[in-house]
UniProtKB/Swiss-Prot annotation:
Keywords: Disulfide bond, Ion channel impairing toxin, Knottin, Neurotoxin, Potassium channel impairing toxin, Secreted, Toxin, Voltage-gated potassium channel impairing toxin. Disulfide bonds join 5-23, 11-34, 20-39, 24-41. This is Potassium channel toxin gamma-KTx 4.6. It comes from Centruroides limpidus. The presence of a 'disulfide through disulfide knot' structurally defines this protein as a knottin. Reversibly blocks Kv11/ERG potassium channels. InterPro entries: Ergtoxin, Scorpion_toxin-like_sf. The keyword Lipoprotein does not apply.
């Protein structure tokens, strides 16, 4: 689910990050971005 994407992610500070995107899409969201080293999923 979405929270596990955030927990697992250690990404660059901002912008597109493939693993966030993939994880978020699996959780049913449209896309994922990186914000302050955490994945944020956009519904």
């Amino acid at each position: 689910d979405r929270d596990s994407c955030v927990d697992k992610s250690k990404c660059s500070k901002y912008g597109y990050y493939g693993q966030c995107d993939k994880c978020c899409k699996k959780a049913g969201d449209r896309a994922g971005n990186c914000v302050y080293f955490k994945c944020k999923c956009n519904q």
